[in-house]
């Protein structure tokens, strides 16, 4: 990844230890917060897939809105987990990682854990949600940098395939996610890929619905969810 350089992801109690990765010239930093740091509830169950992941899928949360302080971003992660576990009946928060407006990386399900964020891709991808509504506004630079650094680190540690394909959520289901402005941004990133309808089909995954608060006043293009929410 160009211009990232030395990526230093400070590990705070995370079992998948993040270390220094020599990726070129220049220095970028990001901090990873563990599940215990943001007060995550225990998952109902954890299912792993064999890495490295061939896909990275970018999301926006839409709701909750962008957070700029770490306490607010921690609450946003808890709110998303509550919605996914308690309302949808899923095993855990749907995403692999969250990115806050504070520039922090928040551990969701983590690497090599089957997610609940993208149909057909849950068992072969890293799902990264940038907290906020990015339909018309671009996320702050620190959020974009954190996402890039996380991807670069995942490649360096072998969690993400070096030839990974970068996708926006809208490419794998009928949704505005990750928002038009953010989608335009990631379209310029290395590894962004245009896909066809037959890629990534898996019989082990099921359609999922992104985190949208039930009282959101300006809904995204709606998803057609199954009668019973999948527990993934």
UniProtKB/Swiss-Prot annotation:
Changing residue 175 to K: Loss of function. Residues 213-232 are annotated as: Disordered. Residues 1-15 form the signal peptide. One of its GO terms (biological process) is negative regulation of biosynthetic process of antibacterial peptides active against Gram-negative bacteria. SUPFAM superfamilies: N-acetylmuramoyl-L-alanine amidase-like. InterPro entries: Amidase/PGRP_sf, Amidase_domain, Peptidoglycan_recognition, PGRP, PGRP_domain_met/bac. Its EC number is 3.5.1.28. Disulfide bonds join 67-73. Transmembrane segments: none annotated. Keywords: Disulfide bond, Glycoprotein, Hydrolase, Immunity, Innate immunity, Metal-binding, Secreted, Signal, Zinc. Glycans are attached at residue 196. It comes from the Eukaryota. Binds 1 zinc ion per subunit. Residues 53-179 form the N-acetylmuramoyl-L-alanine amidase domain. The record marks 95 as: Essential for zinc hydrate coordination. Monomer. Belongs to the N-acetylmuramoyl-L-alanine amidase 2 family. N-acetylmuramyl-L-alanine amidase involved in innate immunity by degrading bacterial peptidoglycans (PGN). Probably plays a scavenger role by digesting biologically active PGN into biologically inactive fragments. Has no direct bacteriolytic activity. This is Peptidoglycan-recognition protein LB.
